[in-house]
A protein has these predicted regions:
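Peptidyl-prolyl cis-trans isomerase
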Residues: 1-95, 106-178
Length: 178
């Protein structure tokens, strides 16, 4: 058995309709362009903020979550953390992985700080109705049956950060003053 000829399928409306939630290539491309624009705008906004001091408790919480996740993954696969991060994670050493985990934790904390500061400085409030509406949309997007299941897995405050982030991105894209 061998591959004699490679054929790259043409992207068509039919393929898009069969493989995605979109009906046409244009719809798919338009939506993906919007998503990329949102990500780029948000990344630029967050990166423009300077953090003077990271709160230890929150940073440690996110750091520990990531470390514990990899420890559980290693245990599940019957390997050590060192094997897990070097063989499967692509890190040269456990110390490199720990440095990545700290950087990742700080990134998450910075993003939350930016969200809460921007929301507070701009008097942006999240009504219960808006929380439920956007929370349900996010729940579906992340593969949960409903908002209640999403809250059970992630907690209300994490969902609020996501909802506020989406609100802020819309304001930034809409060129509202933020």
């Amino acid at each position: 058995n061998s591959i004699k000829e490679k054929t790259t399928p043409a992207v068509s409306d039919k393929m898009i309709e069969e493989k995605t939630d979109y009906d046409t290539v244009k719809e798919f491309c338009d939506e993906k362009s919007k998503e990329i624009a949102k990500e780029l705008v948000w990344e630029k906004y967050v990166s423009s903020a300077k953090v003077n001091k990271y709160p230890k408790e929150e940073t440690k919480r996110y750091y520990d979550q990531l470390i514990n996740y990899y420890k559980q993954l290693a245990a599940y696969n019957g390997v050590t953390l060192e094997t897990m991060v070097s063989s499967f994670g692509g890190y040269k050493s456990v110390d490199d992985f720990f440095a990545y985990a700290l950087s990742s934790a700080k990134s998450t904390v910075k993003e939350e700080m930016v969200v809460y500061l921007t929301v507070r400085e701009n008097n942006i409030e999240l009504s219960e109705e808006e929380y439920k509406k956007q929370g349900e949309e996010l729940a579906k997007e992340y593969g949960y049956e409903n908002l209640k299941d999403y809250e059970s897995a992630n907690g209300r405050s994490a969902i609020e950060v996501n909802v506020y982030t989406d609100m802020l991105i819309e304001k930034l894209l809409g060129e509202d003053e933020v």
